[in-house]
Structures are given as structure tokens and as C-alpha cells.
UniProtKB/Swiss-Prot annotation:
KW rRNA processing (keyword) present: no
One MF term in the entry's GO annotations: actin filament binding
Gene behind this protein: VPS16
Topology versus the membrane: Peripheral membrane protein
Compartments reported by the entry: Late endosome membrane; Lysosome membrane; Early endosome; Cytoplasmic vesicle, Clathrin-coated vesicle
Protein name from the UniProt record: Vacuolar protein sorting-associated protein 16 homolog
Disorder cited: Dystonia 30: A form of dystonia, a disorder defined by the presence of sustained involuntary muscle contraction, often leading to abnormal postures. DYT30 is characterized by early onset and predominantly cervical, bulbar, orofacial, and upper limb involvement. Some patients have a more complex phenotype with neurocognitive impairment, including mild intellectual disability or psychiatric manifestations. Loss of ambulation is observed in some cases. DYT30 inheritance is autosomal dominant with incomplete penetrance.
Keyword annotations from UniProtKB, A to Z: Autophagy, Cytoplasmic vesicle, Disease variant, Dystonia, Endosome, Lysosome, Membrane, Nitration, Protein transport, Transport
Length: 839
């Protein structure tokens, strides 16, 4: 353990700092870092280098090359820079490289050097040029702030939703500030800048002069400033060699340190961690690195070569041509276990486990000491926590073995923390591998989340590793393997050196029916890459027609989209395609397409019936569908025409169509309707009243109700209304009028073709039993019983039923007998039944 703490450096009495190597860089740089624009993404992100050929002391002879590397120095991309002079580079939270040019244009590149998009910081910037720029991160996303040649600031807090803000002018500012940075306070981005001995804070509304509390006297200039990773703290380097550290609000001073160096540093960044004991700032010069905090002494390191500092959530990454290191405050659990002569529970447990492996009795002594103090649970937790903060797998294993050893002597220690730490460390060790090059710490990993880490592996096209992690952690398929495979497929369609057939087959073999994977999304990506045929092949694997059709329409494959919509059976989908086709094709081609798709044609006809009647007529004409054309003209005659002449003309057209369709019945019926309309018009002119649009029967009934019996009879003869129907019409009309005398005359005019039972029924319906009895006696024998029962003459009905010896009639009469009034009649029927059975 003594050897293990050899690289620990105390800062004051409360904290230790250590620096260890992450990778030995093998990136074969052709330029010194000082000659390059450098950008390194946080959370173990990639490194971008662009040799600066626009420096005045080094005239450019060739175009510069933009190189992108992993944190381990593995090359990811290299491209010849063909655009304008670049002022600054920076990485967004999505690991997109932002290149801020002198003309105010910001070019956005992917991790593999693929151009994504560009945007401008405004016309004023274009006119005045960019002097300096900062890329910063907020809870809203990644932002860009620039300083123009007119010494004005412009910023956007989120490049994904670009909204430019021109900051207020600084009074009397005639030259570029000596240093400046972006502060994020209360969800608002501010600019803090130094002009000589003065500090100014710019927000969207005003420019305010600010003074750091407790600043040492004699300051004539601020040479460097740094804001912490979380934007909570600020450090200022003055020309007197003092470093002031305080809150970012400039309301509270934390400490001040005199480094006795007045030369401006190359970089200054914060080095702290969550729940840090000692907040510290790391300052770098050409060959010196200094860690300062609230202590009279500092920690100093010699830099053998040009180095670059990358602030992280819990420390600072330092890389040069040959190495990549991590400097951080030793976590509390590690300090408790490993510091010299530590008697912490975790330290004793680690020693106990080592002695146990040696089969030494000291293991029992250490263990008993921990148990006697009641600190075994704390010891296990310390070892688990410390294992998470260790970078070397061997030390992780030692600590986890100690934790596992201690757990054996605890009855109810929850296993979740141990299991999760083992899983997390296995994931971290996998991504820290040199060939992967993502040197995440445990704290960074927890802040980043597993989903974001998987996204970053996908971004690096490390699909197998991402899938292995998903399977190892048993993530739900939709969040894990399915999502990774979908990304892989979207990348696969961009490989233009492979045939469409092979790509489609490979994707289907790999994905199959994996839940959560949308073939339509993959096909859309293929179409976006200009591979239309591949997109169509991929859509064949998409089971949801609702996802197939919109993309097919977008690809101008409307006829195929129509076929797919019809196959789905979704009428709404078919209508969507039809309306698209209607707007896309000329009228003739559209109708021809419909003729080849009967279902679509039928649906379109239904649509036209409600929306486009003239189009419907054209469809019938084109198909020579005279039957439907006749029906169309009949509907049109009533829907569109109010004049009787126009209506008759439309009906005549319909009759002609029916004759062409060889439907003589429909043609004759239409001609009869024309005659009826003309007659109704004449009746209205001669008799008054409302006759138009009545049916033939209603017309006859209306005439009878109006007392025009002769005209009604003449109408019946003209239209060959059968006698039975005419008698029913007249019977009903006279009963409605309650003209019983005329009804009796009508019944005696000749023998009724409908019999006399209807007369009985109609009279009873009008509650006139007296009139009903008149007709009951005239009812024929086969309906006599029913008529007598209708008028309530149960006794006579019984006599008739007995006389007819009809069992059904006897049962009918018996069902109408009531015990109080018809008892004798019921007995009479029962005796008749008994006599009939004896015979």
C-alpha cells in the first residue's frame, strides 16, 4: 500500500491529488500541439487537431488537415480543410465538432469527419470578422459565444435551436479584452470579460462592472480566467501572479494563492470532484503544471512536452504527444483505505483478505477487530466504493475480493451495491480499452448514464461492444439491442460499395423480427443516401403498411404505395394514397391507374359520391357504366335541380342510360316517374296543395283525402295500380278521415278484392267497434273467427270455431277467454274438444 500511494500529492491537510496514465499515445503527430487548434470533448471524448496555417508567423504553404482521434490516440477521421480560416474548435454535448470560422460561419462535423450542417452567427459577424470564440455547455445543449472585430459579443445558448443574442456594448472598449469566458447562472448565459484592472459582466440587457471580493491590491490586468465544470466557481489569474478563487456569482471569495509567476499561463482549469474536500485549480505553462487551492503550498509537475488540459466532472485530463494522463483528487474511500497507517474499516478488511489468501491467522485478527467495532458493513461499503474509483483492474479485483470476503460474515448485507459495482466496472474496463478509447471514470459514467454511453459507442460504430453491454446488463430490447441494431442498419445502408440486394439481405438476417426495430426508418435513411431501390427492398420487411406507404409516396412510388395500402385493408390509408395520386398524375393516367385497382376504384367512387359528383360521372362515362350513370342522373335530378323541367330532363338522361344498360325495368320506372312528376305539377296547378315529390301511393292517398276520388281512380288506372293496392289505399284514407258513411258505400260498391277483414282491422284501429261489427258479419268463413275476436264477440267466435271444428281456431278463442266473463264459453269449447276426441 505504501508503494500504491507513491504518486499521491498532498494539497493542504485535507486532500491528496494523484496523476496516473490513461494511455500511451501512439498517434504520430506531425505538428506540435502549440501549432494546432485543439479541442477535446469531456467525458473521455475525442480529440480534434487542426494545424493553424493562418498564424502570421507561419505562412501556409499547403491546406491544413483536420484530424480526429479517440482519447487513446486511435485515428477516427482525417480530412483536408477546404473552407476558410478557423478561429476555434469545440465539441458539442452530442460529440459533434463545431468549427468556428473567421467569417462567422460554424461548420459542424461528425465524429468520423462527415459534414453535418453549418450555420452563421449573423451578418454583423460576417462584416467584422471573429477574433475569438468559446464553445460551452448548458442544460439546454451546447452553445457558441464569439467576440467580433468590433469588440462586440454574440452568443447562442443552443446550436440545435439557434437563437442569436447580441450582447450589450462594453463602454470604452477599444481593443480585445485580455481574457473572457462564459458563465451560466440561473439558466441564463452571461459573458465575463476583463479590460485592464476592470471586470464586466454582460447579460442580455446590460453591461455591469463587477469586483471580486477580497482581491489582492495592485492588480492592473487579468491574464486568464476559468469557470468550473458545473459553472459554480470562478478562478482569475492576475498580472501580479495571484490566483483568486471564488463563486461564479463573484459574491464570495474561497481563497487566493500567490504562485509567484507573472507570466500568463497557457491554460487554467478547475480540478474538483463531487463532494470535494479541497477545490483546486490547475494552471499550465510551457513546462510547468501547478495545482493550487486553499493551502499555502501547491503541487507542481514538470511537463516534458507540450500538453493540453481537458476539464472533467471529477478531475483534469492531460495529454501530450506521448501520454494521456488523469489528475484528480483522491476519493474519500480510496484515501481511507490506502493512506499510510490507516486503521479505517476498509483498510483492515483489505488486509484481512490478503492474509486470508496467504492462509495466515492474521486474517482472523483483522476481521475480529472490525467486528468488535461493529464496522464490518462500513468496511464492505468502503471497499466497494473504492473499487469504483480505481483505474487498474488488478486493484479493482483486490478491493472487490475484500468486499466479497467481508460480505460472507454479514447476515443481511444487501447484494445490489456489490453486483452493480461489478457490472459497472466490467463496462468501464471494456470502454477504457486502448482500442475503444473512452477513459470514463466511475463518477463520469454515472453522470453520463448507460444510455448515453451506448449512444457514444454507436457513434463510434462499435456495435458489437454496445450489443454485448446491453446483453450483459440485460437491458430491455427496445432500449438496448434493438436500438443498437437499428443504428447498425442505418449505417449499413450507407455502404455504397455493397449491392442493394446484399445489404437488404444482411439487414434482414441480422434484424429479423426484432421488436422495436422499424424497417421504415432504415429505409428512410437509405432513401436519404440516394439508394431508392434499397429503400424499397427494406420496406418489404416492414410489417406495418402505415409505415410503408408514406415513405413510398415520398419516393415517388405512388402506384406501389397504392398496392401496399390496398393489401393492408386500411381504407384511410388507401384514401391518402388516392388523393396523393390525384394531385400527382394527370386525369387520364389517374383514371387508368384506378381501373387496374378495383378496390381503390370502388373507394374513390364512394369518395366522389360525397365530394366530387362530376368526377364520379366522368368515371362512369369512361367505363361505359350506363347502369351507374343512370343512377347518378336520378340522384342528380333531385339533388341539383329545383325546376321541374330540369328534373325531368335529368330523368330522361337517366332513362336513356338505363336503356343502354339494357335495364328496361329501370328505364320504364324512370319514365313512369317523369309522367308522375308532370301529373303532380298539373294537379298542383289545378287543385292546389302539395303533390310534387310525393310517391305514387301518397299521391293517390292525397287525392282521396282531398275528396278527389275520381281523379284518384283515374291515376290508378293510368299507372296500373292493382285493385288490391287501390282498395288498401282508399280504405286507409277514408278511415283516417273517419268518413264512415263513404267507407260503407265504398265497401258495397263491388266485391272487395282484399276481403272484409281489413275493414274490421282499420275500424278497430280507429277505435270504432260499431263500424267494425258491420264488416265482421261480411268476413269470409276462413277469417270469421279472427274478425269476431277483433270486435270482442268471444261467444260467437266460439260458436263459429266449434262449427268449423278447427283446433287452431278453438285454441285462439280459448286464449281470449277470461275467467270472470267467459267461463261458460271456455267450458263450451272444452266440451266440444272432448266430443271431437271421442269421435
Amino acid at each position: 500500500m505504501d508503494c500504491y500511494t507513491a504518486n499521491w500529492n498532498p494539497l493542504g491537510d485535507s486532500a491528496f491529488y494523484r496523476k496516473y496514465e490513461l494511455y500511451s499515445m501512439d498517434w504520430d503527430l506531425k505538428e506540435e500541439l502549440r501549432d494546432c487548434l485543439v479541442a477535446a470533448a469531456p467525458y473521455g471524448g475525442p480529440i480534434a487537431l487542426l494545424r493553424n496555417p493562418w498564424r502570421k508567423e507561419k505562412a501556409a504553404s499547403v491546406r491544413p488537415v483536420l484530424d480526429i482521434y479517440s482519447a487513446s490516440g486511435m485515428p477516427l477521421a482525417s480530412l483536408l480543410w477546404k473552407s476558410g480560416p478557423v478561429v476555434s474548435l469545440g465539441w458539442s454535448a452530442e460529440e459533434e465538432l463545431l468549427c468556428v470560422q473567421e467569417d462567422g460561419a460554424v461548420l459542424v462535423y461528425g465524429l468520423h469527419g462527415d459534414f453535418r450542417r453549418h450555420f452563421s452567427m449573423g451578418n454583423e459577424v460576417l462584416q467584422n470578422r471573429v477574433l475569438d470564440a468559446r464553445i460551452f455547455h448548458t442544460e439546454f445543449g451546447s452553445g457558441v459565444a464569439i467576440l467580433t472585430g468590433a469588440h462586440r459579443f454574440t452568443l447562442s445558448a443552443n446550436v440545435g435551436d439557434l437563437k442569436l443574442r447580441r450582447m450589450p456594448e462594453v463602454p470604452g472598449l477599444q481593443s480585445a479584452p485580455s481574457c473572457w469566458t462564459v458563465l451560466c447562472q440561473d439558466r441564463v448565459a452571461h459573458i465575463l470579460l476583463a479590460v485592464g484592472p476592470d471586470l464586466y459582466l454582460l447579460d442580455h440587457a446590460a453591461c455591469s462592472a463587477v469586483t471580486p471580493p477580497g482581491l489582492a491590491p495592485g492588480v492592473s490586468s487579468f491574464l486568464q480566467m476559468a469557470v468550473s465544470f458545473t459553472y459554480r466557481h470562478l478562478a482569475l489569474f492576475t498580472d501580479t501572479g495571484y490566483i483568486w478563487m471564488g463563486t461564479a456569482s463573484l459574491k464570495e471569495k474561497l481563497c487566493e494563492f500567490n504562485c509567484n509567476i507573472r507570466a500568463p499561463p497557457k491554460q487554467m482549469v478547475w480540478c474538483s470532484r463531487p463532494r470535494s474536500k479541497e477545490r483546486a485549480v490547475v494552471v499550465a505553462w510551457e513546462r510547468r503544471l501547478m495545482v493550487v487551492g486553499d493551502a499555502p503550498e501547491s503541487i507542481q509537475f514538470v511537463l516534458d512536452e507540450d500538453s493540453y488540459l481537458v476539464p472533467e466532472l471529477d478531475g483534469v485530463r492531460i495529454f501530450s504527444r506521448s501520454t494521456h494522463e488523469f489528475l484528480h483528487e483522491v476519493p474519500a474511500a480510496s484515501e481511507e483505505i490506502f493512506k499510510i497507517a490507516s486503521m479505517a474499516p476498509g483498510a483492515l478488511l483489505l488486509e484481512a483478505q490478503k492474509e486470508y489468501e496467504k492462509e495466515s491467522q492474521k486474517a482472523d485478527e483483522y476481521l475480529r477487530e472490525i467486528q468488535e467495532l461493529g464496522q464490518l458493513t462500513q468496511a464492505v461499503q468502503q471497499c466497494i466504493e473504492a473499487a469504483g474509483h480505481e483505474h487498474q483492474p488488478d486493484m479493482q479485483k483486490s478491493l472487490l475480493r475484500a468486499a466479497s470476503f467481508g460480505k460472507c460474515f454479514l447476515d443481511r448485507f444487501p447484494p445490489d451495491s456489490f453486483v452493480h459495482m461489478c457490472q459497472d466496472l466490467r463496462v468501464l474496463n471494456a470502454v477504457r480499452d486502448y482500442h475503444i478509447g473512452i477513459p470514463l471514470t466511475y463518477s463520469q459514467y454515472k453522470q453520463l448514464t448507460i444510455q448515453v454511453l451506448l449512444d457514444r459507442l454507436v457513434l463510434r460504430r462499435l456495435y458489437p461492444l454496445a450489443i454485448q453491454i446491453c446483453e450483459y446488463l440485460r437491458l430491455p430490447e427496445v432500449q438496448g439491442v434493438s436500438r443498437i441494431l437499428a443504428h447498425w442498419a442505418c449505417y449499413k445502408v450507407q455502404q455504397k460499395d455493397v449491392s442493394d440486394e446484399d445489404v437488404a439481405r444482411a439487414i434482414n438476417q441480422k434484424l429479423g423480427d426484432t421488436p422495436g426495430v422499424s424497417y421504415s426508418d432504415i429505409a428512410a435513411r437509405a432513401y436519404g443516401c440516394g439508394r431508392t431501390e434499397l429503400a424499397i427492398k427494406l420496406l418489404e420487411y416492414e410489417p406495418r403498411s402505415g409505415e410503408q406507404v408514406p415513405l413510398l409516396l415520398k419516393m415517388k412510388r405512388s402506384k406501389l404505395a397504392l398496392s401496399k395500402a390496398i393489401e393492408s385493408g386500411d381504407t384511410d390509408l388507401v384514401f391518402t394514397v388516392l388523393l396523393h395520386l390525384k394531385n400527382e398524375l394527370n386525369r387520364g393516367d389517374f383514371f387508368m391507374t384506378l381501373r387496374n385497382q378495383p378496390m381503390a376504384l370502388s373507394l374513390y367512387r364512394q369518395f366522389c359520391k360525397h365530394q366530387e359528383l362530376e368526377t364520379l360521372k366522368d368515371l362512369y362515362n369512361q367505363d361505359d357504366n350506363h347502369q351507374e350513370l343512370g343512377s347518378f342522373h336520378i340522384r342528380a335530378s333531385y339533388a341539383a335541380e329545383e325546376r321541374i323541367e330540369g328534373r325531368v330532363a335529368a330523368l330522361q338522361t337517366a332513362a336513356d342510360a338505363f336503356y343502354k344498360a339494357k335495364n328496361e325495368f329501370a328505364a320504364k320506372a324512370t319514365e313512369d316517374q317523369m309522367r308522375l312528376l308532370r301529373l303532380q305539377r298539373r294537379l298542383e296547378d289545378e287543385l292546389g296543395g302539395q303533390f310534387l315529390d310525393l310517391s305514387l301511393h301518397d299521391t293517390v292517398t292525397t287525392l282521396i283525402l282531398g275528396g278527389h276520388n275520381k281523379r284518384a281512380e283515374q291515376l290508378a288506372r293510368d299507372f296500373r295500380i292493382p285493385d288490391k293496392r287501390l282498395w288498401w289505399l282508399k280504405l286507409t284514407a277514408l278511415a283516417d278521415l273517419e268518413d264512415w258513411e263513404e267507407l260503407e258505400k265504398f265497401s258495397k260498391s263491388k266485391k272487395s278484392p282484399i276481403g272484409y277483414l281489413p275493414f274490421v282491422e282499420i275500424c278497430m284501429k280507429q277505435h270504432n267497434k260499431y263500424e267494425a261489427k258491420k264488416y265482421a258479419s261480411r268476413v269470409g268463413p276462413e277469417q270469421k273467427v279472427k274478425a269476431l275476436l277483433l270486435v270482442g264477440d268471444v261467444a260467437q267466435a266460439a260458436d263459429v270455431a266449434i262449427e268449423h271444428r278447427n283446433e287452431a281456431e278453438l285454441s285462439l278463442v280459448l286464449s281470449h277467454c277470461t275467467g270472470a266473463t267467459d267461463g261458460a264459453t271456455a267450458d263450451k269449447i272444452q266440451r266440444a274438444r272432448a266430443q271431437a276426441q271421442k269421435k
